[in-house]
């Protein structure tokens, strides 16, 4: 007997960030990034559309610069003194072999869309000089963007697309908008040299960017122009960035709620004004944990946010907040209700079935799956048995 049920195509992708930390060996490595890559490569054999990596694609090692036993005789000029790092200060060492190993650990059988985090845009500037390359005597040249250039080099001839901003359809029901969020940071001016390096390599613009406001304006115009070009309505809009809109974190033994960027909130509201009937999801990283919650902006735009900075970086402490408690950051138009907060490594599996979106966090440390909105039987083919699996609604 032939079934009259209409089959619904299922699309899915994997999302995480904050990952390339230390030497990666996906087969025998015991550090966090190796374990995540081992699991990811096995999981990527499933029928997924692509992998979204939300930045911080390499972490230089923080080390303390040893004090020299003897100082050179003679007085140095004030200008010379100011330009040097103070002895005993912490510096950041780029280990090229570790950076390369991480990119070689990524799955090679599926498209990877990779955005930039703040660590990818780090370089020595006139005001901040702390990056060294492979040796304590080799300081990175000013405005050299060694990390970014090395990452782009590793992506060449691989299945990796570096994305500063991109808008595309997962299906007729779901739109994905990948956004650069580092330009909304307070110290984003320090990233201008590497933004221009990226633009030059990719032939994006002819004239170098000179200020961050100009860059924010360019991104906003590109996104809104693409939305106008599409002229469609979507059941779901998934926005992907590096930084959370807001979220709970621990800092100096205090529980801190991240203050949102006003400029970024304005961009989100501009997107919302074009698609008010859509369901909104925001996937990001930056905090080294898995945190899920609901954000409401101006009592209009409701966003389900997933912070997934769990790809291999040293983990942050997951603070405890009263379940269901809604908090206002220092911005009256926004509220945040945290629902999940776990300090662990893993990645998020995002599944679309028809007009529904389901999220499954694959926790590799505890060997569990944390489910969000996955109540329908239509998502069962992506499930696996786990005695300790957790479920949230």
Question: Could you say what each language-model-derived stretch is?
Answer:
Residues 15, 53, 169-170, 352-356, ...:
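Generic beta-strand structural signal
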Residues 63, 86-228, 258-259, 263-281, ...:
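Extended active-site neighborhood of metal-dependent phosphoesterases/phosphodiesterases
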Residues 1-66, 84-93, 248:
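N-terminal active-site segment of His-dependent metallophosphoesterases
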Residues 49-51, 235-237, 280:
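Conserved acidic residues
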Residues 1-7, 65-88, 214, 354-358, ...:
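Compositionally biased low-complexity segments enriched in polar/charged residues
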């Amino acid at each position: 007997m032939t079934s009259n049920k209409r089959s619904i195509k299922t699309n899915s992708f994997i999302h995480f960030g904050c990952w390339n930390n230390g030497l990666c060996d996906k087969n025998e490595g015991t550090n966090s990034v190796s374990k995540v890559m081992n699991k990811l490569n096995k999981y990527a054999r499933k029928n997924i559309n692509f992998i979204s990596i939300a930045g911080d694609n390499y972490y230089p090692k923080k080390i303390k610069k040893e004090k020299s036993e003897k100082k050179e005789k003679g007085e140095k000029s004030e200008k010379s003194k100011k330009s040097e790092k103070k002895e005993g200060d912490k510096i950041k060492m780029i280990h090229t072999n570790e950076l390369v190993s991480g990119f070689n650990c990524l799955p090679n059988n599926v498209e990877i869309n990779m955005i930039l985090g703040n660590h990818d845009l780090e370089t020595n500037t006139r005001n901040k000089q702390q990056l060294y390359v492979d040796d304590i005597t080799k300081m990175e040249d000013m405005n050299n963007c060694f990390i970014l250039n090395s990452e782009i080099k590793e992506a060449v001839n691989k299945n990796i697309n570096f994305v500063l901003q991109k808008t595309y359809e997962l299906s007729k029901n779901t739109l994905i908008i990948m956004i650069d969020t580092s330009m909304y940071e307070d110290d984003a001016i320090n990233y201008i040299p590497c933004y221009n390096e990226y633009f030059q390599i990719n032939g994006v613009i002819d004239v170098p960017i000179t200020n961050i406001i100009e860059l924010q304006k360019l991104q906003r115009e590109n996104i809104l122009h693409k939305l106008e070009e599409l002229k469609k309505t979507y059941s779901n809009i998934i926005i992907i960035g590096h930084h959370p809109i807001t979220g709970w974190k621990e800092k100096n033994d205090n529980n801190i709620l991240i203050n949102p960027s006003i400029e970024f909130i304005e961009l989100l509201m501009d997107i919302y004004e074009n698609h008010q009937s859509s369901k909104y999801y925001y996937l990001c990283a930056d905090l080294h944990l898995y945190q899920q919650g609901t954000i409401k902006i101006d009592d209009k735009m409701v966003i389900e946010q997933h912070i997934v900075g769990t790809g291999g970086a040293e983990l942050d402490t997951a603070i405890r907040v009263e379940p269901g408690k809604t908090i206002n950051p220092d911005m009256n138009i926004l509220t945040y209700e945290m629902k999940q907060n776990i300090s662990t490594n893993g990645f998020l599996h995002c599944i679309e079935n028809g007009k529904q979106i389901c999220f499954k966090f694959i926790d590799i440390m505890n060997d569990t799956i944390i489910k969000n909105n996955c109540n329908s039987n239509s998502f069962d083919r992506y499930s696996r048995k786990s005695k300790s699996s957790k479920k949230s609604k």
